[in-house]
Each structure stands twice: as C-alpha cells, then as structure tokens.
UniProtKB/Swiss-Prot annotation:
Residues 57-67 have a biased composition (Polar residues). Residues 69-92, 173-182 have a biased composition (Low complexity). This is Homeobox protein Hox-D9b. The gene is hoxd9b. The keyword Transcription applies. Residues 183-216 have a biased composition (Basic and acidic residues). Sequence-specific transcription factor which is part of a developmental regulatory system that provides cells with specific positional identities on the anterior-posterior axis.
Amino acid sequence: MSLTNYYSMMGLQTDEPYGAHFIPGGLQGSSVGCAKPVRGSEEEDGTTGSHIPDFSHLSNKQTSLNGFSAWTNTANPTSSSSPQLHSTPSHFQTHHFLSHHHPYYGPQTQTHTEHVASSAASESRFVRSWEGAPAPEVNLSHVSEEFQACVPPQTGLPSPRQTFDDVKPENSPAPHDSPADSSFDRPTEVVLERLGAAEEPKKKPERKKDGEERKTQTNAENPSVSWIHAKSTRKKRCPYTKHQTLELEKEFLYNMYLTRDRRLEVAGLLNLTERQVKIWFQNRRMKMKKLMMRDRRSVNQ
C-alpha cells in the first residue's frame, strides 16, 4: 500500500469527533501534503496523472458528519480532490503540511476560523455545536441593566428621617390623666433612680475607709494607742494553735521530760508529729532556764 492510500484510508476511517475537528485544515493539508511526492515522481517520469488515485467517487459520499465530505474544500463543497491536487502550488502544499503538524500556530488558526465563519454564513444547519465558534461578546450594559432590575429601586426605601418621624409619636409619653401614668412614662428617670440606688451602697464603704484613715492618723500622734492596736510584722514560725500550745503547757507542768510512749500519745491527741512535740519541749525547757537565770540575777542584785 502506498503512502497516499494509507493517509487517505486513515482520513476516511477516523472517528466523528476527530474528523469534525481536523476537517478545516487537517485532512485537506494531509491530502495535499501526501500528493506532493506523487506529483514529483510523475514529473520525473514524464507521465500524466494516471497513477494518482481518483477519489472522485468519494466526493459525493455523505459521511456521518451531517452530509459534510472530508475530501471537499471549504469554498467549493462539490469539487473533487483531483483538480485540487493539480492546481495547488508546491509552496502552498508545504505550508499546509506544516500547519497540519502544528495546529496551534497562526496559519491553522486562521483557516479554522475562516472555515467556521464561512460555514456559519452559508449553511447554518451544518454548524456543529462542538466547533470552536467564538462566543458572542457579553454586553456589559445589558448585564448591568439586568443586575439593576434585580435590586429594588432606592427611591422605594424609606429614609432614616422618615422612620424616626414615624416611630417618635409611638414612644411619646401618655397624658397625665390616663391611668397608664406610672414609672413607665419616663424611662430615663427610672433608669437614673435605679443607677443612683445602685451607687449608694458603693459610697458607704468609701466613707468607712475615710473614717479608718482618720483613726490611723490620730493613733500615729498617740504612741500608746498605736502600740495597743499595732500588728506584729514578725512571721510566725510556730505552726501550733492556741489549743495545742495550752495542752502542751499543761503537760510540761506535770513533767518536763516525756518518755517515748507518752510523747507518741500526746502527739496523737493533739494531731501533731512526735518530732513536733519533742522540739516544743526542748524549746520550752530552754525558755524556763533563761527565766531561772534572770530570777537569780535579780535576787543577787
């Protein structure tokens, strides 16, 4: 099978979407490009176009693409492929052959758009929905008008001043003769009264604080009074309570030294540890010795 017959059979057996997409420049360029070596061989042999396959019987055959033939030209739908092969110059064949392999460059795009425009103008029923026809430009003025139609007109909206004037008579106080004359007639006065009642308890502690400050000032002038009301700044090191201290003092009066069993018993009664009871008795004995030494010195003097 020759190269020309191979490309021609591929062009006829392509699927419908591929055929529809490459009809304007693809198949035409392929058929023209494939015809170039055949024509050169004929010129070398000096023979006529007897070896060129004749596809004239296929030109009138309607394919599944709404009666559009793959071998017809866009300008002359009924013309055959053989005259087109003889009449096309060599440089134009090369140009279409390159545009077939590079479909996204300028020449292929121009031929495609020209085909769409001509087919849409001449035969509107053959225009396909999958063709890349340019979308119509959107009229911005029309869109804006439609958008404005969706929005209610500004003139129908009431102004804030009108709303205030309409609401004001409803909130006006009732006449004094009406039975509704109560605290609700003047809400501002009621709110002020309640705020004043809430602020009164806050003012009383402030007055007490002022009195305490005056007392401290008078106490500072009198040292005897200030000594009585003075608070010790020394941190307590002893964790014993008054009840625990009193019970330990009683136990110390009975016996200055405790046995281990008695120490554990006192610690359990007073909720203390054995070490705490032991330390307290040691400190208490040291204190008693100091007091005895002072008494002796006072007697000797």
